[in-house]
């Protein structure tokens, strides 16, 4: 019996290095990939509980780093999206969930026809990165105010640039978090579940996220920046137990 294709998909893209042409380590030795496993489990569990047939899977990278103009993880993301389209058809809605370098790859690949939205966690947002491919997409970027690896200020700037380019975009600040999302891990997990399922339409967006996504292109960067505790928490979004959180 042929297996029915999923109703939606979430592609998860883990972090990496600025430069590294070697393949990522296998299994648990791939620490950025290992860190995203609780997010994969949490989103998949939420979908099952709601009776939704959503495919949640990590993208495999051929190389460990971004590698300048090569933008290797971007091409890996596009290849994964093309494979999904071949398997499930042109109408499959996809949300890209990326952390750090993976968020950069997700943002770059968002112009693919299957992509409905992007959730970027502690994203790496260099000032010169393009945003035109984000037009018509929902983009929510989540960043700790204490991140020392990637810049929350750069994330706020990209959010505003994306909005001017035609995206529905906003930023959520996690006070007291960190780049690896170890501090306040449960909050990162719960928020991510709510954002991903909300963007796919199988759940409600938390707090004022929907309102922020609807801001006009001329809105100031600060208008599109929400605080997890003040604007979203504790909020109606799901509390889902995750191992290690």
Question: Where are the predicted features?
Answer:
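Short, surface-exposed "cap/lid" segments of acyl-processing enzymes
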Residues: 1-51
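A conserved short beta-strand
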Residues: 114-125
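C-terminal catalytic histidine-bearing segment of alpha/beta-hydrolase fold enzymes
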Residues: 168-245
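Alpha/beta-hydrolase active-site loop
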Residues: 67-87
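Short beta-strand immediately N-terminal to the catalytic nucleophile in serine-hydrolase-like folds
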Residues: 96-98, 121, 142
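Short alpha-helix in the alpha/beta-hydrolase fold that links the catalytic acid
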Residues: 25, 151-161
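Short beta-strand/loop motif that positions the catalytic acidic residue
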Residues: 134-135, 140-147
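Gly/Ala-rich beta-loop-alpha elbow adjacent to hydrolase catalytic centers
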Residues: 97-102, 106
């Amino acid at each position: 019996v042929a297996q029915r294709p999923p109703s939606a998909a979430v592609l998860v893209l883990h972090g990496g290095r600025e430069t590294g042409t070697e393949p990522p380590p296998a299994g648990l030795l791939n620490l950025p990939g290992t860190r995203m496993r609780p997010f994969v489990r949490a989103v998949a569990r939420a979908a099952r509980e709601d009776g939704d047939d959503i495919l949640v899977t990590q993208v495999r990278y051929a190389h460990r780093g971004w590698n300048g103009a090569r933008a290797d993880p971007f091409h890996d993301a596009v290849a994964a999206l093309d494979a999904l389209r071949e398997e499930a058809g042109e109408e499959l809605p996809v949300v890209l969930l990326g952390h750090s370098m993976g968020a950069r790859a997700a943002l770059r690949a968002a112009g693919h026809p299957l992509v409905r939205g992007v959730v970027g966690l502690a994203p790496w947002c260099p000032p010169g990165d393009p945003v035109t491919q984000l037009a018509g997409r929902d983009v929510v970027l989540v960043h700790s105010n204490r991140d020392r690896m990637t810049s929350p200020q750069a994330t706020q700037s990209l959010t505003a640039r994306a909005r001017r380019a035609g995206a529905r975009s906003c930023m959520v600040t996690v006070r007291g978090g960190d780049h690896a999302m170890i501090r306040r891990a449960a909050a990162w997990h719960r928020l991510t579940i709510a954002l991903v399922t909300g963007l796919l339409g199988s759940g409600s967006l938390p707090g004022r996220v929907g309102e922020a996504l609807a801001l006009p292109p001329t809105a100031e960067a600060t208008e599109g920046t929400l605080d997890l505790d003040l604007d979203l928490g504790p909020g109606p979004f799901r509390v889902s137990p995750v191992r290690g959180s």
